Swiss-Prot record:
Assembly: Component of the heterotrimeric velvet complex composed of laeA, veA and velB; VeA acting as a bridging protein between laeA and velB.
Name of the featured protein: Velvet complex subunit B
Entry keyword set: Cytoplasm, Nucleus, Sporulation, Transcription, Transcription regulation
The encoding gene: velB
Stretches assigned to coiled coil: none
Induction (free text): Expression is negatively regulated by laeA.
Source species of the chain: Chaetomium globosum (strain ATCC 6205 / CBS 148.51 / DSM 1962 / NBRC 6347 / NRRL 1970)
Residue stretches of biased makeup (Low complexity): 272-283, 361-375
Domain Velvet stretches: 1-173
Length: 441
């Protein structure tokens, strides 16, 4: 390199800077300046300068029209920040030819205005301990914007991407980025909405007043309607998952129980006395149990009962149809003299001191084990809500039996030790059926 003089080097700015943002947020000059070093082929036919590690290029900020300006009148040295010096890179050009390039990927300007970049090439000569100026060049003018007016960084150029793929540290951007400022003009906002296909609800006029929270009344009404629609959708999805009810069908929710109480181990007794395998209540016999014909009132009450939470069954209802361990109702059976009653009847509540007469024949009015009379509630053609008189359906399957199996007077069964009736193996209390009250003492 000792044979190469000052006139043998030539600098060419391959990528000119276009604009920059004031360096409050350290925005780099876009695109990054790239300078190519070219040497006279006759002086260096072997292109040995590409491997010279002592060639450096510096960047300095100057005014728009000044190429040789005075340091006192020009920009300060502190106005240009970042990496101001670049070493030589041996890279492949876009035409796949080898060349020497200086890349400035981290340059920022701290003052708003229009400037140029002055590039000066130096060679360090360690033997002589000197630094020789070999060449210089100046870039095209570029504008430094304030933060509010900065148009944003553009997409990376093909030359920048090519050098980045070869190992040079450069910031790549796939698409153009616009600055999102709070004081954007109305025209810019409308252009963005039009490009994205969005039609805002906020009218853009000079007389449009905003509420204190930043929303217009029209926008607030729109938000309110969207909120109501969301609640309606949630309600529809909730009821679509609930069991559907048809007029004439009675489920657990129509009697005030929760809709999923039927899935628990202790199931509630069906009011119609149907078998567990039957999904619907039996409709045999005349009268039909007094189903309600007004579907509007029925569904309004079912909706109220569905949201009112689970309720307990009255004690009188438990005495009508006792429950077994499986959770289903047991049809009333006549009492048999001398035999212990089933276990569900042992837990029957005592309504009064009235007892069964001794040796009552099966089917007699006095031998019935239930105090419920279907004739008292089946006379009305409309159903009353639970909790009122006659508010429970009658069992239509036993309508043909008439009054033979029911009594109008409440009865109770006295408790006796099982040993007193010839059951020494029993370990609990037995029930004596058909015994007089005096026999218990």
């Amino acid at each position: 390199m000792s044979t190469l003089g000052q006139g043998d080097f030539e600098l060419a700015v391959r990528q000119q800077p276009k604009y920059a943002c004031v360096a409050i947020e350290r925005k780099p000059i876009d695109p990054p300046p790239i300078v190519q070093l070219m040497v006279n082929p006759r002086k260096d036919p072997g292109r040995t300068f590409l491997q010279n590690p002592y060639l450096i290029l510096t960047a300095r900020l100057i005014r728009k029209g000044d190429e040789d300006q005075d340091e006192q009148t020009g920009p300060k040295e502190s106005d240009l920040t970042g990496t101001l010096v670049s070493s030589l890179y041996s890279l492949k050009d876009t035409d796949n030819s080898q060349g020497g390039f200086f890349v400035f990927g981290d340059l920022s300007v701290r003052r708003v205005g229009t400037y140029r970049l002055a590039f000066i090439l130096y060679e360090l000569r360690l033997a002589e301990k000197e630094c020789w100026l070999l060449s210089r060049t100046v870039s095209d003018p570029f504008v430094v914007y304030a933060t509010k007016t900065f148009p944003g960084l553009a997409e990376s150029t093909f030359l920048t991407r090519s050098f980045s793929d070869q190992g040079v540290r450069l910031r790549l951007r796939k698409d153009s980025r616009t600055v999102s400022t709070k004081k954007r003009t109305i025209s810019q906002a409308d252009q963005i909405r039009a490009s994205q296909g969005i039609h805002g609800y906020l009218p853009h006029d000079a007389n449009h007043d905003l509420s204190p929270n930043g929303h217009s009344p029209h926008h607030l009404r729109r938000l309110s309607s969207l909120h109501d629609q969301a609640q309606l959708d949630r309600s529809r999805s909730y009821y679509s998952e609930s069991p559907q009810m048809r007029p004439g069908e009675y489920t657990s929710s129509s009697y005030g129980y929760a809709p999923y109480d039927d899935q628990k181990p202790h199931k509630r007794a069906r009011m119609d006395g149907a078998s567990p395998d039957s999904p619907h209540p039996s409709s045999a016999g005349g009268g039909g149990g007094g189903y309600e014909t007004d579907t509007t009132a029925y569904h309004s009450y079912a909706h109220h009962a569905h949201h009112s939470g689970p309720r307990t069954v009255p004690d009188a209802l438990g005495s009508i149809y006792p429950l077994t361990t499986s959770g289903y109702a047991v049809a009333p059976q006549p009492a048999l003299t001398g035999l212990p009653m089933p276990s569900p009847y042992a837990s029957m509540p005592r309504l009064d001191t009235t007892h069964l007469p001794p040796h009552s024949p099966a089917g007699a009015p006095g031998s019935a084990s239930s105090a419920f009379s279907p004739g008292t509630i089946g006379s009305s053609s409309r159903r009353s809500p639970p909790g009122t008189a006659g508010g429970y359906p009658s069992y239509a399957g036993h309508a043909h039996a008439g009054q033979a199996m029911f009594t109008s007077q409440p009865t109770s069964l006295p408790y006796h030790p099982a040993v007193a009736h010839g059951h020494p193996g029993a370990g609990g209390l037995g029930i004596a059926v058909g015994l007089d009250l005096d026999e218990r003492h």
